[in-house]
């Protein structure tokens, strides 16, 4: 009996005690790391949901801004239609050109009058358009920062797609919009799924909506900015920009106005 007890005691050596302490330390460390990672995940989800709420509020604000503007835009389009029916080809072209200039002036004026808001991070911005892609159930406002700095853009991207480059929305040139890829259904996460022929709608502050058609999609290095060129041959174009799922490249979706 005593021999058995002695034998059992021999198994609990200093080395075994040391290993048990090490295992216990690693176990506690693992639990701590899991808790930290879980906390980061919960915070990230909270931050994304909060951003989605802000984005929805921006969309509601845009809808309020557009109230009462649709009628004026429709009248302008009807005037063009009357010219087509009653005027000569040359007169029609002149009237269409004049109408485009008036419309551009209206957009510029509306953008200048747009209310500047302040983000939670203290950056100034204003809503300038709404972008909608029916295929992927995407509809968000497009905001423009006051300074256009990288820090400002990165901050505003948490709440909305942001104007990256170009003239006013729905005007001749290449209107570029950048949006986050959260690898879910929020913001531009599904933009990489678009294909040639898909429709993208852009509504400016006058209430005018223009349909654009995807004609090219490709990826580039983050430093490659050739797709933001304003040389469009007199066409109205729209470019959507987001990152790939691994964030190593940028997804570029080029669109042109549907006439």
Go through the PLM ranges and name each one.
Residues 15, 19-259:
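Solvent-exposed, non-transmembrane regions of membrane-associated and secreted proteins
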